[in-house]
């Protein structure tokens, strides 16, 4: 029998046309960057699906941010209403390096969730290189704008006016390495090909594996 908790959804926020943040009363303590497993009764995926927490540990409500990709779990979660209950696990995972070094987040789309949780909770110098298809698909817009994180946005599809903090196309990992402190710790999160590509380029740029934490998102 699975060991699950019941969490009531108390707030919903539409991040963009296909992405929803679900807030629920936090039934556990957690470390920034951890994730939970969501279970669906009757699903053939009995082990559930993992979702990173997009909230900070000190906040009263916990949250997950879900992009509707048409799969069983994303469709289910993106159709929930306030008052519905989720069956979830406790938080787990060790993505957070818990270091005093400067932190550099490299993320694509919703994979920002665990990196945002870590950077927003950090007291040291923080950087974020964030790739999304276009500005209207950016998640956590208000929170990012109000944060002290040094952010560079990269729009991979829609053409944007290149101004401070905004760029067209994909980021250059070698340039990122040159721009940030030499002792920085890197947090990389995205699809498996994205994470593998960034990891390889960090390694080629002389960044040791002990200074890189990775998390892979699988869409479902």
Segments the model singles out, each with a brief description of its role:
Residues 72-220:
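FNR/FR-type flavoprotein reductase catalytic core
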């Amino acid at each position: 029998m699975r060991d699950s908790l019941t969490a009531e959804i108390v707030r919903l926020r539409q991040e963009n046309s296909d992405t929803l943040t679900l807030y629920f009363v936090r039934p556990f303590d957690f470390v920034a960057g951890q994730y939970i497993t969501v279970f669906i009764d009757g699903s053939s995926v009995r082990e559930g699906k993992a979702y990173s927490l997009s909230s900070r540990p000190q906040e009263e409500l916990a949250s997950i941010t879900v992009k509707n990709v048409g799969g069983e779990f994303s469709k289910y979660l993106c159709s929930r209403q306030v008052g519905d209950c989720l069956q979830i696990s406790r938080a787990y995972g060790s993505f957070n390096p818990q270091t005093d070094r400067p932190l550099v987040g490299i993320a694509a789309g919703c994979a920002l969730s665990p990196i945002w949780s870590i950077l927003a909770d950090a007291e040291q110098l923080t950087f974020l290189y964030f790739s999304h298809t276009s500005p209207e698909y950016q998640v956590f817009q208000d929170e990012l704008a109000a944060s002290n994180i040094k952010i560079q946005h990269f729009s991979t599809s829609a053409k944007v006016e290149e101004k401070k903090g905004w760029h067209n196309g994909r980021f250059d990992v070698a340039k990122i390495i040159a721009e940030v402190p030499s002792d920085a710790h890197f947090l990389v999160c995205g699809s498996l090909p994205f994470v593998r590509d960034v990891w390889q380029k960090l390694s080629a740029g002389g960044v040791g594996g002990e200074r890189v934490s990775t998390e892979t998102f699988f869409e479902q």
